[in-house]
Amino acid sequence: MSASLLTQSEITTRLRAIGFRIRTTGEMHQAVRAFKVGWFKLGPSLLIGGAATDAVGPRTSAALDLAYERHQDGKSTMSPHFSFNETKCKCGGAYSDCRRIWPTRRAVINLETLRAELYPGGLSPVSWCRCTGHNKAVGGATSSRHLKGDAVDIPHTHSLAQVRKEHLYTGLGVEPDGHVSHVDNRPGSTTNPTVWHYSGS
């Protein structure tokens, strides 16, 4: 990885390549912060005191270079098994205020752990971040954790008991077949999570 500083144009090119939408300076700053939050185990942490700033120094420049190279090589860009593209809102840019990508740190770490424990063959998120417009369009709750970037809809192939015993999540949504299809980190307890059941169609 290069230790030199990237130019603003290079930063924008790399962020766009890995999935971020950047039309303004404000969106670029948002994207840099989201990149730092999501960046996990592909290099040194980019957080300072657990927080992300919009400054791009040598370490962040090197991380952006690596993420860009991994994207070009068809590898994950955010963590060992997940890419920023997998977290982005599925509105496709239909809503002008959509930030596109804003996963929480905990969501990334927990999904890596869940994959290792229950999905060793691979786990593809069904839905992660949602902007207000898209969340409303798909019938999501007004207080949906997808709006905050800490909820992920997953393939419902594992039972409530299996997912619950991992003690990773405080919110679990269960399909009529008894398998979990939604996990989140709302305020609460991972040992006694909030559980709800979706009705059949």
Placement of each model-derived feature along the sequence:
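A mature extracytoplasmic/lumenal domain signature
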Residues: 56, 60, 68, 127-129, ...
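Extended, low-complexity, intrinsically disordered C-terminal regulatory tails
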Residues: 111-139
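Cell-envelope/ECM-targeting effectors and their regulatory/trafficking segments
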Residues: 1-116, 141
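Generic non-transmembrane alpha-helical segments
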Residues: 18, 113-121, 162-168
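Short, solvent-exposed polar/charged micro-motifs at secondary-structure junctions
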Residues: 65, 133-139, 182-186
